Amino acid sequence: MQYPVDTHTHTVASTHAYSTIHDYLAVAKQKGIRLFATTDHGPAMADAPHFWHFVNLRVLPRMVDGVGILRGIEANIKNREGEIDYFGDYLSQLDIVLAGFHEPVFPPSDKATHTEAMINAIKSGKVDIITHPGNPAYPIDIEAVVTAAAEYGVALEINNSSFEVSRKGSEANCTAIAKAAKELGATLVMGSDSHVAFSLGGFDRALSIIEAVDYPKDKLLNRSPMALLNFLAQRGHKSVADLMPLFSDDIA
């Protein structure tokens, strides 16, 4: 089964990625992806796009040839306080805000620091999805993080790229996160973390973990465009109202 939604992609605007929006649209059409988010790295990363890149995402059309586009960011969690590198009214102009740890911005420290930073980001109300929380370079108190995510309505990502090209050794942590999410009622989403369009919608490894713990697939945000759009609307993203009529025939 091809899940029709991908929340985590990078374009050539992040210079260690290799595809354009046009490339992603073409692959989405081929694979049956109905909605994807463009989420380039936040400005604190060395090769990230300029701040204006995110401001000007408003020029992107809502839908091209039947494929919807969400305007987003993968922000960086910068410190123990859980602050991210995108702020103010600009956040409200985006459809979706991802955030996670990246070594060039927040070097690995210790379990207590990572846990506090992640929970503070969750509590901030600014972040919709925590990216690659299973990264073994950043050990966390999984139960504490998942509990906070469930309480504050923030989704946790099972990152497919973590099992293929980055963050080697993530399997055990991701399995524990998925299991805790099932037990504590937290929302999960699979992210391809594509840095080239060919991997858009690639969830095989992430899905194997979801299935191994028997996480309810009717709670996965990837299950339909409306499932994700409803989630984002509930989190205060008024801008997604523009997209909802385009998926009016969709079952959440």
Swiss-Prot record:
Cofactor, free-text remark: Binds 3 Zn(2+) ions per subunit.
Any one annotated GO CC term: cytosol
EC annotation from Swiss-Prot or TrEMBL: 3.1.3.-
Keywords: Hydrolase, Metal-binding, Zinc
Any Pfam family: PHP
CDD domains, alphabetized: PHP_HisPPase_Ycdx_like
GO molecular function: phosphatase activity; zinc ion binding
Family classification: Belongs to the PHP family.
Name of the protein in question: Probable phosphatase Shewmr7_2686
Origin species: Shewanella sp. (strain MR-7)
